[in-house]
Regions:
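Small beta-barrel nucleic-acid-binding modules, primarily SNase/OB-fold domains
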Residues: 1-344
Length: 344
């Protein structure tokens, strides 16, 4: 196994954040940091013990420019003792997703189409997750965020372009929550080029087990482009839990694109079917068997090819290797100049 730098952040998960009591779904949560010395630690490859690190203090991703000073604002990655975590390995059905209005030239504004849309089984997944977390007997559950980073990477490698920490959550009994969600069939596998080989292997094993679970939702995964249902919207916090039955759901990555496509077509901002939309976007990914052998030098394929994929998704979820968008964290330096954080 290749040597890595290990990052860990001790904190607590506030269970009240999850739907129906809150708005969090099954793959993005907020980890409430214990604001005390030693909460954020790193163990470099050549070290045997974890050491405190201040790499993330007052650091963040560049935001909008201040309209008064003209200086670029920094969106802190640790804000008021809280980090936002994107659970790596998984993609859960969308509990609330708004169409991406970029590129519509304002054509979506005022149309009433920008709403929080929802997928079938999103509620079921998060309700089952909360039921499991409640077995630990605390509404504020102690845990650790962990991320294994390549030695050539700096602190920014743990952060995605939205300022979220990307990694795993380890529960008090040592359970890896990310793998548990896959094993229970409560999420779809999502593999990225930033993941280490062993992480890919154990994720696939967990996903394959989860697809066999009769209690999970993975068995209801649908690789066909079902008709978009605009009546499925986010149900407000406090709503009663409903049985979603055996209604199938599309891969969340494709659903997000389908939601935006639908809004654009309704606003007459795009002419064509969903396949046309995907073809125009020309997003690319790697094929896992080839990526294992050649890494990022492997051929990149379009996310969708009408000729081969027809009205659905051509590969299995575990065949896709998606590219993690490059990100870095910065601080405001002298004179408001942005300075990249590269050292631990």
């Amino acid at each position: 196994m290749a040597k890595t730098n290990s990052l860990e952040i001790a904190g607590t998960i506030e269970l009240a954040q999850f739907w129906p009591n809150g708005k969090s779904d099954a793959d993005t949560t907020k980890l409430m940091l214990t604001v005390a010395p030693g909460s954020v630690r790193v163990k470099l490859a050549e070290q045997t013990q974890f050491q405190n690190t201040s790499a993330y203090e007052d650091a963040g991703i560049p935001g909008k420019k201040d309209t008064v000073t003209g200086q670029t604002k920094i969106e802190l990655v640790i804000k008021n003792g809280t980090i936002t975590v994107r659970l790596q390995r998984i993609d859960a059905p969308e509990l609330h997703y708004r169409p991406d209005a970029k590129g519509s030239d304002g054509k979506l504004k005022g149309t009433g189409l920008i709403k929080d849309y929802r997928q079938h089984q999103a509620e079921t997944a998060v309700v089952k997750l909360v039921a499991f977390l409640q077995t630990f007997g605390s509404s504020q559950l102690p845990c650790k965020f962990v991320s294994e980073l390549k030695t050539s990477e700096g602190p920014g490698a743990a952060i995605d372009k939205y300022g979220r920490f990307v990694g795993d959550i380890i529960l008090p009994d040592g359970t890896n929550l990310n793998l548990w969600l896959l094993e229970q069939g409560l999420a779809v596998i999502a593999l990225y080029d930033s993941m280490l080989p062993y992480e890919i292997d154990e994720s696939i094993a967990a996903w394959q087990a989860g697809r066999k679970s009769r209690e999970g939702i993975a068995r209801l995964y649908n690789d066909r482009f079902n008709k978009f249902d605009p009546t499925l919207e986010f149900r407000a916090v406090g709503s009663a839990v409903r049985d979603e039955g055996d209604r199938k759901f599309l891969h969340p990555k494709f659903y997000r694109r389908q939601t935006t496509w639908w809004a654009f077509t309704q606003a007459d901002a795009f002419k064509g079917d969903f396949a046309d939309w995907l073809t125009q976007k020309a997003e690319k990914c790697w094929y896992l068997p080839e990526f294992r052998e050649l890494g990022s030098k492997a051929t990149k394929y379009r996310l969708y090819e009408r000729e081969f994929d027809g009205d659905g998704i051509g590969w299995q979820p575990e065949d896709f290797i998606f590219a993690e968008s490059a990100s870095s964290i910065q601080r405001l330096g002298v004179g408001g100049k942005l300075v990249k954080v590269s050292d631990w």
